[in-house]
Amino acid sequence: VDHSVNEHFSSYSGYLQQVFGARTYKVTVSSGLTCPTRDGTLGKKACAFCDLRGSSSYFGKQGRGKSITDQLNQRLPEIRKRFASQKFLAYFQSYTNTYTDDSSYLEEIYEAALSHPEISGLCIGTRPDCLTDETLELLERLARRKYLSLELGVQSFEDATLQWLERGHDGQCSIDAMKRLRERAPSVHVCAHLIFGSPTDSPESPEIAARLLNSSGVKGVKLHQLMVLEHTELARRWKEEAQFPVLSLEEYTGQVARFLEHLDPKIYIERLFALSSHRDELIAPKWSSERWEPHNFMRQWFADRGIRQGSRFS
């Protein structure tokens, strides 16, 4: 593994550089789909941490419902101007982008993105309980043609935490989904999302998660700290019931370090922590509104302690 870009962990930018041979950036598009925790199937108030936007970033908030091509044409000029990228991936980010019984609709929106002359591949955010056999077949078919990354919302492997987060699935569901992806859609690059810092997490949850991912076949991991945002169930609990503990930057960094040390060095890290893109809606932890302070703190903390991804991997 090439740690040259980063001495502590395998970076996503390095991984994309290897895949595409160029700087690559994601362009957010909306699929118009919802989630089983929003439409009444598993509940109506969404996962406890998720706000009205369905976990989207700033760039994803304009243009929902327009055709995929229109959305890409609208966003690409601004992104080209802001980021010196040569390659672009269409990123179906918000809500659950495989959640429909109509697989022809999925094929239509994915193909629309892939047929755009400037798009080199797809990133699709989804849940482990929203992958039918038909969807896996479609994903594999597309992934044999073009780069396709599936961002899988695992969040935790611990059932107590998944219940506390009101995810509507258990840890085994994620393990099973990763196995089915490995067997039925081996060309898909799976990236698992994890949240550290729920008060229900066991002390050894970072190591447990790393070990489960090591044997899962995933290519990457995206890490988030637990954040309390306005317009979420967590915010309601925080205000109406009791303030639960959230991790300080140092505590979170310690958990990430333990996770990294047990993680296979071949698995790339797409993100070390999440940035709250709407500062005015962040309740806690306050460090989540800063981009560079946590980044620099974590790098320094790792350097001071000689933290390296995979140092305890066996």
What is each of the regions a protein language model found here?
Residues 47, 110-119, 208-222, 293-308:
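Structural recognition of alpha->loop->beta junctions
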Residues 1-89:
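N-terminal [4Fe-4S]-dependent radical SAM core
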Residues 75-116, 121:
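A contiguous, low-structure linker/loop signature
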Residues 46, 86-88, 118-120, 146, ...:
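Short loop/turn motifs at secondary-structure junctions
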Residues 116-119, 180-190, 216, 254-268:
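A structural motif corresponding to the C-terminal end of an alpha-helix
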Residues 25-29, 88-90, 122-124, 148-152, ...:
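Hydrophobic faces of well-ordered beta-strands that scaffold small-molecule active sites
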Residues 57-66, 94-107, 122-185, 196-216, ...:
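Conserved non-cysteine loop/helix-boundary elements of the Radical SAM core domain that shape
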Residues 2-14, 23-24, 220, 227-314:
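Auxiliary Fe-S-binding modules of radical SAM enzymes
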